[in-house]
Amino acid sequence: MGPGKEKFALITGCGDGGIGHALANNFVQNGFIVIATLLPHESRTHLEHAKIHVIDLDVTKEDQMIPFRSTLEEITGGTLDVLVNNAGICYTMTAADTDVKQVEKMFAVNVFGPMRLVHHLHRMLIAAPRGVIVNIGSIGGVCPYVFGASYNATKAALHHWGNTLRVEMKPFGVHVVNIISGEVATNILKSDVRDNRTLPEDSVYAPLAQLFKDHVNRTPDAMSPDDYARGVVAMVQRRSLPAWFWHGNATGFIWTLDSFFPRTIWDWLFTRWFKLENLVGTQG
């Protein structure tokens, strides 16, 4: 991204202490003017900066998109250098015990939100000297992380949609990067804790109820949001951009296993990590 022109970055989901918050700060430190979105009820004092414009946006609401784009065009003059599809929510549960209504909500934010934003903003990215779309994905979209089947599915969908988007936008000079994120110390898991997420009493996984509870309440060994954001912002400004950018704790390990080992390596690992062998013979 060359000098001499104001650069604009739009980041969705910029709640206090999360990846979006850290990205907003780091983009500003690198000379960008940032447009940060929040839900109407969220505090915004953490985003008080002359170069950060805060706009209310629920990425699941189609009727908010046209007014949002108009406001965005007024700020940027009609172009957009970087779109970061960061807004996301999490839901922890076994695949068999999944509440589909919860999953529908998660897909609405994690998958349909990015689709909606690209649909409405792609011309602004094309109009920029070098438009970049960044999708905040996850290692969960690559490996079968136990108790995360539905979240994993949203990220796998985002990755594959992003892959096709990358190919389709290339003729217009717009780059698309999927970030394959490892563990980052954010608030995304707190909704499970707040909702006191537990296994159903009649679940076939009931023998693992305590392990599930401990998993929900865990404190991951995670990269800080600021370290994560610095890596992403530096990557966005490279001359040559990757299709996938693996970033965050455990990504090197996950990449190695996914690249060089049989697919069933995950079965072996996760069965042992989550003590699934303890379920053998408990039904029937």
From Swiss-Prot:
Signal peptide: none
Record keywords, A-Z: NADP, Oxidoreductase
GO CC, any one term: endoplasmic reticulum
Molecular function, one GO term: triacylglycerol lipase activity
Pathways per UniProt: Polyketide biosynthesis
Induction: Expression is increased in rice-extract medium (REM) and is correlated with the production of pyriculol.
Sites where the protein binds NADP(+): I11, T37, D58, N86, Y151, K155, V184, T186
Known role: Short-chain dehydrogenase; part of the gene cluster that mediates the biosynthesis of pyriculol and pyriculariol, two heptaketides that induce lesion formation upon application on rice leaves but are dispensable for pathogenicity. The highly reducing polyketide synthase synthesizes the heptaketide backbone of pyriculol and pyriculariol. Pyriculol and pyriculariol contain several hydroxyl moieties and double bonds, so it can be assumed that several reduction steps occur during biosynthesis.
Protein's name according to its UniProt entry: Short-chain dehydrogenase RED1
Gene source species: Pyricularia oryzae (strain 70-15 / ATCC MYA-4617 / FGSC 8958)
